[in-house]
Amino acid sequence: MQRSISLTAKRLFVHWNLQGIGNPPTVPSFFNLCGSGCWERSFASASGDYREILRNRLSDIIKVDDAVDLFGDMVKSRPFPSIVEFNKLLSAVAKMNKFELVISLGEQMQTLGISHDLYTYSIFINCFCRRSQLSLALAVLAKMMKLGYEPDIVTLSSLLNGYCHSKRISDAVALVDQMVEMGYKPDTFTFTTLIHGLFLHNKASEAVALVDQMVQRGCQPDLVTYGTVVNGLCKRGDIDLALNLLNKMEAARIKANVVIFNTIIDSLCKYRHVEVAVDLFTEMETKGIRPNVVTYNSLINCLCNYGRWSDASRLLSNMLEKKINPNVVTFNALIDAFFKEGKLVEAEKLHEEMIQRSIDPDTITYNLLINGFCMHNRLDEAKQMFKFMVSKDCLPNIQTYNTLINGFCKCKRVEDGVELFREMSQRGLVGNTVTYTTIIQGFFQAGDCDSAQMVFKQMVSNRVPTDIMTYSILLHGLCSYGKLDTALVIFKYLQKSEMELNIFIYNTMIEGMCKAGKVGEAWDLFCSLSIKPDVVTYNTMISGLCSKRLLQEADDLFRKMKEDGTLPNSGTYNTLIRANLRDCDRAASAELIKEMRSSGFVGDASTISLVTNMLHDGRLDKSFLNMLS
């Protein structure tokens, strides 16, 4: 269809004004607006036959300096090369994502009097859109139309992409409608660009509907279109729609490729539809679509996460039989699974196999190996693996050190953990919240309360963020070592802060107060709780009341506990039974024992010991011991 350039220009300008843009920016200085002067350089050293490079070796231009040198050769040539040859270079640089350089070279062409053509302007529009400078892209479009060039479908598709990435999806939809009105026929690329934009702006239903509209307009979606829709749906968790689209493709006799199957399989795995993922994998093979390493990695990782390491191992064997080489991701998933299953020998063998296959373990691999050894208290082997990692020029990261430090601290080798912390600092790594919290806990577990407090002060001094876990460990440690006053200062600070306190912290403080004999203060805190108490909270408070022989209050709290829907456990019953026995209330004790047994619990060592002693003293008969056992 013949189109009027002036009519096209008029309609596009109307489109801008309708969107509240006003007139596009003035054009003469639009190259300068992007700040591209930094790419200017002297071309005095440029040499070589640019024609031969443009004709046969343009794909060799992979570095910025090479592109600039070639441009230098071209502008030194007299007469100047044709605009077609300049466009080839600009297009190659744009594919390198060096959009700023493209604009800079365009500016220098303009300075030298080298006229741009439609294709040149289209390249500039694409570059400005990719840099999210939509107003400048519109300025170029306005200039090219004033010069008599009419935008083609590629130019307008670039502009469409700019709208989509500038959070102006309604403008993008309007532009496609205007393109149709002006006689342009949007192609598959145009529609796919808009579909991608719709997904970017959470308009999934519109994106899916657009696929049907494409067909109605005589534009057949291709694999890229379907892949875009499948990817968008899977990212949203709309897996059923993605599977339906797969069926629709089959009905339209469009064969899905491995990328589309991989996208759906990976999504099924992430959303825990393991069996469906395995079935789709089988269907994929039946249809003659060869799975690749990405397919296997998704399934192997998924199976490992669900503890199905034997199935994952079978998939690895299947993979090797088909001559599909596993990569570091494959081995990492399996190594992690074997360690979690306690299969240390198998995990080590996988590491050895990686090396035999010339697959370099990465930081994640070594972190998994080190963590696996630490999990099973094989610290010397963990340290040895750490040294091996460093010897292979694989730099340990903060997670590596945190894993080792945690391993040593758990085994009460806190000094070794501190030594690793020093080594980490020497390597230029800064300890994070996990690092400091782990060392604080390590010192408390080793019985060194002062050092734990010192590390906390250092943490605050170094402005390392503290979290709820840090304070939980700190308060528990302080209360355990009788430092209630210090714990109370920190607790009051937390109450005034914006940090959301959990029940563990409240339980810690209530227990600390009760152990210090401050049962009244503990009761006040219990009554002021803003979150629901759990069984530990009730047990701690009941134990505190019993320690002060406030048995009626303890019994009332026991009843309230059950009314609030918190089920008593063995600790609840045994605490109350012992308190009533010490108070010589045999009837209440007997009633509690019956209730405890009917709930499936038995007397613990402390209760049986107390009953046995009271039997020897003649204060109880054997019926109590029989009830307990």
Swiss-Prot record:
The keyword Lipoprotein does not apply. It comes from the Eukaryota. InterPro entries: Pentatricopeptide_rpt, TPR-like_helical_dom_sf. PROSITE patterns: PPR. PPR repeats lie at residues 46-81, 82-116, 117-151, 152-186, 187-221, 222-256, 257-291, 292-326, 327-361, 362-396, 397-431, 432-466, 467-501, 502-532, 534-568, 569-603. Pfam families: PPR_1, PPR_2. SUPFAM superfamilies: TPR-like. Keywords: Repeat. The keyword Repeat applies. Belongs to the PPR family. P subfamily. This is Pentatricopeptide repeat-containing protein At1g63150. The lineage of its organism: Eukaryota, Viridiplantae, Streptophyta, Embryophyta, Tracheophyta.
